[in-house]
Design a protein with these regions (language model features):
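Intrinsically disordered or highly flexible coil/loop and linker segments, enriched in small
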Residues: 40, 73, 90-94, 98, ...
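Class II aminoacyl-tRNA synthetase-like tRNA-binding/catalytic domains
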Residues: 1-76, 86, 149, 176
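Hydrophobic (often cysteine-bearing) scaffold residues that line and stabilize catalytic clefts
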Residues: 23, 27, 77-81, 156, ...
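Short coil/turn segments at secondary-structure boundaries
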Residues: 44-47, 97-101, 130-135, 151-157, ...
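Conserved small/polar residues in nucleotide/adenosyl-binding loops
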Residues: 187-193
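A conserved active-site cap/scaffold subdomain adjacent to cofactor or substrate pockets
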Residues: 59, 63-64, 68, 72-96, ...
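Generic structural signal for hydrophobic core residues of well-folded globular domains
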Residues: 34, 123-124, 167, 182
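Aromatic-residue-lined binding/catalytic grooves and analogous aromatic/hydrophobic interfacial grooves
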Residues: 140-186
Length: 193
């Protein structure tokens, strides 16, 4: 079964065809095949279904946009995303500023771009580079009371994510791009060059 992302699919059985069928959990693999096949730019807006837990930030069914572009880097993709949001917001709302949950969101301004390490330093005051090893990172997490989900196997990357969730996420009101996530956060990440 080729499904891509590290998530469990919803499974059913098609009685007339007598085969098991799966609802898709991502759009990534087929789009990447198109890029390899010679298309320079591809995207899909599609429904995604993941047979996993639910909470206020995770729904098992959602719509995503996935896009890939040859001959660019992730900064080029960041530019594309900003322009996409700016254009859609202007065309749909007639303005580049919208109100969401009582807060004005300025989509038209240049978005802040921070590495995850810089975001944690900015909002938590914690310097990732001061951690000599995983144990030092875990000790720092304990000191700041963000170690609830961590254990003795947690790496510096896990600790960075814990700080991000505890101190950074709630401060990201205006459009902001966070990049250079630690490799432990996603199975398909390519090492930063």
């Amino acid at each position: 079964l080729e499904i891509g992302a590290a998530a469990r699919p919803f499974k059913t059985h098609h009685n007339a065809l007598d085969i098991d069928m799966y609802m898709r959990i991502e759009t990534e693999l087929y789009l990447k095949r198109l890029i390899v096949g010679g298309f320079d730019k591809v995207y899909e807006v599609g429904r995604i279904f993941r047979n996993e837990g639910m909470d206020a930030t995770h729904n098992p069914e959602f719509t995503s946009i996935e896009m890939y572009q040859a001959y660019t880097d992730y900064f080029g993709m960041m530019d594309l995303i900003e322009e996409l949001y700016r254009t859609v917001t202007l065309n749909v709302c007639g303005t580049d500023t919208v109100t969401y949950q009582g807060k004005e969101i300025a989509v038209g301004k240049p978005w802040e771009r921070l590495t995850m390490i810089d975001a944690v330093k900015k909002y938590a005051g914690v310097d990732y580079y001061s951690w000599a090893d995983d144990a030092a990172a875990r000790a720092c997490a304990k000191e700041h009371h963000v170690d609830d989900e961590l254990d003795e196997k947690s790496t510096k990357g896990h600790v960075l994510i814990a700080f991000f969730e505890a101190f950074v996420e709630e401060n990201l009101i205006q459009p902001t791009i966070i990049y250079d996530y630690p490799a432990v956060s996603y199975t398909h990440l390519r090492a930063h060059e």
